[in-house]
Amino acid sequence: WSDKKVWGFDSFSGFPSYDENDDLEKFKNLYDNKVISKEHFQDYQLNIQLKEFISGKSASPSTISSSMDFSETSLSLLEDKINYFELDNIILVDGDYKETMAENMYTDVKFMSVLMDCDLYESHKIALPFVWDRIVNEGYMYLDEYYSLKFPGARIAADEFFENKIDKPRMYPRKPMDFERWFVKKNSE
């Protein structure tokens, strides 16, 4: 076993409020501004069509995820699973990102690898600087929603954050028809 810790930050109460950058129409802006590829935009459009056909409802930020808004996420259920598997290196931080990821929180903690999976614009705006300041040099940040078909705000927030940084999101090499996977390796700070 490793002596490394696995940290998990979550509100365990569902999504926070939606920002205008989470509006699904932002995908059109991303495409028009050549931020996302034609293939990405077409995949998004197909995803929307399928979701609306299956649900019979118009897609929106609050209905686009198959997990809905994650309001049914259970801290106690997750803790039970952690205990069942006797995983003693996991630290769960329960609460609103504005409080749990404040600049003065966990200042002595360092991350070597981070899975950034917080879906919405505002969550990314809070989490990105908090996590980036704690990633060790040569550490990795995996951007789960950078190639999202549901959450445009994640891409917008990441691009805003990395705009003035030397390190930029990069796509893993892929074969045709593979899903895009994006990461940032911290080399500069």
Residue ranges and their predicted role:
Residues 1-189:
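S-adenosylmethionine/decaboxylated-SAM
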